[in-house]
C-alpha cells in the first residue's frame, strides 16, 4: 500500500491498527500555517514587504511599527533599489506582515487593519502595532492566532 510517496507495509490485517497508522501519517502531513506564513514572509524582499504593509496599514502605522520617526521612510523602503530597513526594523516588519497575513487570510483586509490598530485585550489593551514596536512579538502572534481560530471570543 502506498500513501502519498510513502510506502506503507501492513503486516497485520487488523484494520484498527491500519486506521491508527493512517491517522498518524495524516497528522504528520498537516502543514502548520504559522510556519508556512513565516516562510512566505521570509521570501519577500524588504521592498515588497514594506510595499504590502504600507498598502494595507498605511505609512504612519508602518513607521511606528518599525520604530522609526520618519513617516516617509516606509515609502522609501517600498521603492525598488531604495534604502533597506535596519535589522531591528525589518524584524518588526516581518512579524507585522505575518500577523497581518494570518488575519487578512481568515477575515479579510478591513478586519485585519481594524485588528492591527484597535486596542487588544490580549495585549493589555495595547494595539498590536504598538506591541510589535515594543518588541512583544510572541504575545502579538498568540493574539493573532487566537483571533483567527476563534478562541478570542
What are these regions (language model features)?
Residues 2-153:
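Non-transmembrane "mature" sequence context
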